[in-house]
């Protein structure tokens, strides 16, 4: 199975989550797992992150921390993902050294070129479809993926409302990875380990 999924955590982590994550990652199509928790104390975050790191390492999945490069370094994550409002990408790159650094570029060629100048590891574009995770996210269209495929040598991640019916057009347009969260963790019809199998 191709490793094309960039999996994002649910907004809240409970005790059952770790077994569920283990089952999902054992399906073999996840390349990255991003821990994205807002409004959480640092010590609680570190506890959760350490447990997750053990699971991602077991499955050879890259562990990415959202927003906070200092926490990413502390938990020995493989890298950090930053939005445009999460602080200086230049400083993050300096601190993270050879770790993975990904940046959200929305639907913007200007932001993409700026990210490339800062030597990021991958670029994320979106939101391509309506997303439960970020209902008010800026919209992106497929043209940005086609442009990125032609002009950017770094891997491209597509974000926003992605499901088993729409992901293939993103891959065809130029995305190397597809970022998924709600379809896996909040799926009313499928358990997470079955939902992840829809992306081959």
Predicted regions, residues:
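Alpha-helix-loop-beta-strand connector modules within alpha/beta enzyme cores
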Residues: 46-65, 91-108, 137-164, 197-200
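N-terminal small/glycine-rich loop or linker at the start of catalytic domains
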Residues: 1-9, 87, 92-94, 149-150
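Short secondary-structure boundary segments
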Residues: 11, 37, 84, 105-107, ...
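N-terminal active-site wall of soluble small-molecule enzyme domains
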Residues: 32-95
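Catalytic cores of alpha/beta
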Residues: 24, 63-80, 107-121, 149-158, ...
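Active-site mouth loops of central-metabolism enzymes
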Residues: 1-19, 100-107, 157-158, 162
